Amino acid sequence: MSTLHLVPDDLKQLYHVREWRNAAGVLTTACPNEWAEIIEVLRAFRLLRSEVQAAGGNKSPIARQIDGGFYAREWQEKKFETAIKIDDEVFESPTHKVDCYKGRVALELEWNNKDPFFDRDLNNFRLLFDLRAIDVGVIVTRATELQAIFKSLGKGSSYGYSTTHHQQLWPRIEGGGGGGCPILTFAITPALYVDDGPPTMAQIEGAQVQPDESKS
């Protein structure tokens, strides 16, 4: 039984939304405050032409727009220190940083990375869920059909098929990549695109001087 009916209709008109193991139901009942903030951030987001064309460096303006919405609501990037103890011997079990974490919700943004980042995210969710550190994982990525917009803006080569998008994500989830962790995914669709004109010089320069980041 799906619990996607708990996702507001306006979000389903803007994003492709899918769930694994009733993730929407888990968010609604176990993490209502975090769920409300996810809805707020995703409702406010728009995919701006100026940011698509200005995108550069190691973290794009698009990623910063979404991450910034969560950080403004006191979500934080987090690295969990995990280990397995057998008798008196401790085995380190390192995890990767989670982009946005609050309560018991882990959220990853994969706008335009190499697709193995999905494997990393799902393995992280699986481990953290099995260790009872999180109740649910959320991934925000892009819909594959945005490629037509990128091509029209001369950015098609920057968003190849082997980068992170919805069609690359779901075979991994259905193949068990996230284990038993409930996972909710949002894919940014053309319905969110706004042609606000080409980027200003300030936007271009701002994209070029961003500090080194692992996510784009």
Question: How would you label these PLM feature ranges?
Answer:
Residues 101-108, 137:
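Glycine-rich, often proline-containing surface loops adjacent to acidic residues and nearby aromatics
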Residues 133-143:
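Conserved beta-strand signature within the Rossmann-like core of class I S-adenosyl-L-methionine
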Residues 143-216:
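Domain-level recognition of nuclease-like catalytic cores that cleave nucleotide substrates
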Residues 104, 111-113, 189:
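Short, flexible loop/turn elements at secondary-structure junctions
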Residues 128-134, 174-178:
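Arginine/glycine-rich "motif VI" loop of SF2 helicases in the C-terminal RecA-like domain
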Residues 108-117, 146:
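Short beta-strand-loop-alpha-helix junction that forms the active-site gateway
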Residues 52-54, 64-103, 116-123, 130:
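Active-site metal-binding core of divalent-cation-utilizing nuclease and nuclease-like domains
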Residues 1-69, 204-216:
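Nuclease-adjacent, charged terminal/linker segments that flank catalytic cores
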